[in-house]
Amino acid sequence: MKEAIIEWKDFSFRYETQQEPTLQGIDLTIYKGEKVLIVGPSGSGKSTLGQCLNGIIPNIYKGQTYGEFLIKGQVAFDMSIYDKSHLVSTVLQDTDGQFIGLSVAEDLAFALENDVTALDEMKGRVYKWAEKLDLLPLLDQRPQDLSGGQKQRVSLAGVLIDESPILLFDEPLANLDPKSGQDIIELIDQIHKEEGTTTLIIEHRLEDVLHRPVDRIVLINDGRILFNGSPDQLLATDLLTQNGIREPLYLTTLRQLGVDLVKEEQLANLDNLSISKGQVQLQNELAKETPALQSLFRLEEVSFSYDDRPILKSLHLDIKKGEKIAIVGKNGAGKSTLAKAISSFIQTEGRYLWEKQDIKGDSVAERAERVGYVLQNPNQMISTNMIFDEVALGLRLRGVDEKEIETRVYETLKICGLYEFRNWPISALSFGQKKRVTIASILVLGAEIILLDEPTAGQDQKNYTEIMEFLEELHQKGHTIVMITHDMQLMLDYSDRVLVMVDGELIADTVPASLLSDPELLVKANLKETSIFNLAKKLDVDPLDLTAFYKERREGCKLN
């Protein structure tokens, strides 16, 4: 008989600062040793459920609760945070916010030190988990100096060392390149099997989590559970698309191909589908002529070092007017440093040519009138309280006449679909709307190139689509779009050129479909093929042709 380890019974929760409950009538039992994925759009209540589990609610965020919530048969909110920490361990989305020690070894030992563990036992457990998670060579290093994947392993070791029976992962893939994300999912699965932990994963990237099996998926929206069952059962419904969650790419492609999936019972794993070689025939469409584009911004021999360590190595890059470019590569490849160089945030060696004119001497303000740099988190860019004032800020700092400011701000707000909100406080906006405000604040300065760092990281399908369709509109109006991204599907769907960076060098300049069909290049860049590649192998068709077919269908084109 299965043993219940976590139980919510008709459970509701309302934050002190809100009138309506965030969780409503939750009935959910998690059994010992299960591995459960919790999905839902932004604001659905899934993070609140996790915060109830790990004690952030009610110890940090207060509110009113109704119904029952039990952990191992005990009333959860009656437990001390200390007792709960020995039952539930959490790996946060922001690993840097979780580090305590000055070295990896100190960080791993932190929980044991708090428990006054004997020194010999402490050393033994630190060594055990460092060895298990391949951290032995890193024990003397600062956690902050590690790659994204290494940081995740240190965070995981830091909670595993306490040997809690319940592990909670809060969006573990949000800041990782594709290969590092895959490695973490494999590691979570390995720990789950070897240690027998009860594992809960809160994550938007459903297909990436399903790289390894889960027992159940719980879909939450508007504070209620809409689905609680197996991955195969969920994928057979329309609930994912109805609730703003991206379905696996191979399923989308199969539907485009006209394959009947109604009788398929194991949709969660491509290998288990009954489709076979020769079932689908692709016709190659004649290659479309690409109009010649003019050079807009050219970088020549650009190099940059930090503490005598080369970060950018003699880069050559020609950004042409009207392009949509994705910059990809593993964590630490130099992508963000390149963005800072393009934006004149750092001083580098090399030449910068704007329409063949040397602009290396640009100040940050002058470069911002050519290239607008949009950070991943809009809250880090916003400086004022009101929408109009935020968009007007750059013009006011430049001493522009107030009458002209009003004209230019109103025009930009109309372009960005924000004119009706011009007198609103920014705090009243959604994440996607805030993103528009930050883009408006750079467009108003006249920027031709919009440079975005992870434009959709951590966003559900609704916000993802809203942001990317807005960027498509700006592209249609003549803007050049450059995006740094870890999202291979975003790269495929929304770019026509991809730059691949490895260790500060551009090792490839190609089109998305070609990159995703080149296993050797993907390995070099710590990326991974999309499930279209694996689907192509199963159907015995050319991966490049199938990827091109998907992209054309997505853009509304039909093969002859």
From Swiss-Prot:
Enzyme class: translocase
Segments forming domain ABC transporter: 6-247, 297-528
List of residues binding ATP 1: G40, P41, S42, G43, S44, G45, K46, S47
Pfam family, one: ABC_tran
Keyword Cell inner membrane among record annotations: no
Keywords for the protein's UniProt record, in alphabetical order: ATP-binding, Cell membrane, Membrane, Nucleotide-binding, Repeat, Translocase, Transport
Cellular compartments per GO CC: ATP-binding cassette (ABC) transporter complex
Top-level taxon of origin: Bacteria
Protein family: Belongs to the ABC transporter superfamily.
Name listed for the protein in its UniProt record: Putative ABC transporter ATP-binding protein SP_0483
